[in-house]
């Protein structure tokens, strides 16, 4: 009897969770697609942040560009529009570039604010992408939006999902 009761609770919880996820996904906001991006991965150093600041000052007034960054414990990624590549490489000269990946696209998706209180949203999205054979190079997120970085060839298949 206890096992059956636990099973009913589990099924009920599963239904409520998937219902909440579906509701959030139906209320997704804007989806923005950007192409011709380059992903730079640099080793963390004492001079990396000052160089990022210098780079941001140089591109501050540039219109219609893509720029995002994320910092881990040992490395920092900077993703930029291809047109910014010469400026970035000049400013970051002397830094250790671990990897550079060209020909990338990004899809940025805005989620409703309640997404942070509902477990499983990202799992649901990434599971579906995996089933469709979409390879994700990187994911960068804020509280209410996330950006999926992938090869430009993959972006068309993602849009059709």
What are these model-predicted stretches?
Residues 1-4, 120, 124, 153:
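Conserved active-site and cofactor/substrate-binding residues in soluble primary-metabolism enzymes
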Residues 159-161:
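Conserved small/polar residues in nucleotide/adenosyl-binding loops
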Residues 73-75, 138, 145:
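Cytosolic regulatory regions of ion transport systems
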Residues 1-111, 115-117:
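Regulatory modules associated with amino-acid/nitrogen control
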Residues 81-82, 148-156:
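Short glycine/threonine-rich loop-to-helix capping motif typified by GTGT followed
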Residues 111, 142-147:
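Active-site-proximal beta-alpha loop/turn segments in soluble metabolic enzymes
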Residues 118-139, 147-149:
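A structural feature that tracks compact, well-ordered secondary-structure segments
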């Amino acid at each position: 009897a206890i096992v059956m009761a636990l099973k009913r609770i589990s099924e009920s919880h599963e239904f409520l969770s998937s219902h909440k996820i579906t509701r959030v996904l139906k209320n997704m906001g804007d989806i923005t697609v950007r192409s011709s991006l380059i992903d730079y991965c640099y080793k963390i150093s004492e001079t990396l942040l000052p160089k990022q600041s210098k780079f941001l000052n140089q591109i501050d007034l540039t219109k219609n560009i893509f720029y995002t960054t994320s910092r881990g414990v040992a490395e920092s990624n900077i993703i930029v529009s291809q047109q910014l590549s010469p400026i970035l490489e000049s400013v970051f000269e002397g830094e250790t570039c671990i990897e550079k990946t060209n020909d990338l696209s990004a899809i940025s998706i805005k989620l409703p604010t309640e997404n942070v209180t509902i477990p499983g949203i990202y799992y649901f999205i990434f599971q579906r992408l995996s089933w469709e054979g979409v390879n994700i190079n990187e994911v960068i997120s804020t509280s209410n939006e996330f950006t999926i970085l992938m090869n430009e060839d993959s972006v068309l298949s993602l849009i059709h999902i």
